[in-house]
């Protein structure tokens, strides 16, 4: 048995809420970005992203599912021909919500919801940089270990030289009184 969603309804009834979201999604796909209240934008996001996921699949069955919601065939064609293929390599996160200043009349919190138009080049660049740094890290550790090994060898040689110098100084210091006595004699 179908159960209604919990929480407040946008527009009062379930049918009006469905109509609101269908109209908001149509406007979003038609214009790329729309300004609406913050709560409607937050509720529209999963609704619109599911439609984009259907468009990515691109089958006739998915097109018919989208046509149940969006009645404008031109918008559905745009969704399947342009928007879906654009996000083919992206796993979710097709929309962005940006909060703006409150509405002047009733001070309602407003937001802009838009389709993300940037490719994920930055995330691919970050991923490549992380892989490169992770490959360089073991090499850097090997260099650090080699430097530490050289440093320990140098420290040992330095310590040996210091010990020899101290022994030489003590030997000359011990020989010095004997040399003075020999001069006096």
Swiss-Prot record:
GO terms for biological process: translation. One of its GO terms (cellular component) is cytosolic large ribosomal subunit. It holds the Pfam family Ribosomal_L17. Keywords: Ribonucleoprotein, Ribosomal protein. NCBIfam families: L17. Belongs to the bacterial ribosomal protein bL17 family. This is Large ribosomal subunit protein bL17.
């Amino acid at each position: 048995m179908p159960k209604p969603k919990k929480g407040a309804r946008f527009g009062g009834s379930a049918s009006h809420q469905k109509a609101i979201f269908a109209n908001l999604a149509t406007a979003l796909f038609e214009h790329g970005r729309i300004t609406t209240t913050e709560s409607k934008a937050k509720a529209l996001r999963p609704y619109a992203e599911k439609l984009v996921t259907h468009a990515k699949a691109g089958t006739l069955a998915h097109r018919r599912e989208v046509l149940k919601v969006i009645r404008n065939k031109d918008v559905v064609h745009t969704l399947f021909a342009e928007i879906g293929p654009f996000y083919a390599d992206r796993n979710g996160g097709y929309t962005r919500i940006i909060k703006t200043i409150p509405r002047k009349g009733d001070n309602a919190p407003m937001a802009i919801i838009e389709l993300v138009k940037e490719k994920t080049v930055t995330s691919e660049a970050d991923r490549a940089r992380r892989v490169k740094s992770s490959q360089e890290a073991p090499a850097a550790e090997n260099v650090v270990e080699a430097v530490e090994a050289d440093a320990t060898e140098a420290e040992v040689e330095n310590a040996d030289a210091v010990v020899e110098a101290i022994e030489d100084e003590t030997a000359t210091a011990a020989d010095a009184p004997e040399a003075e006595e020999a001069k006096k004699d």
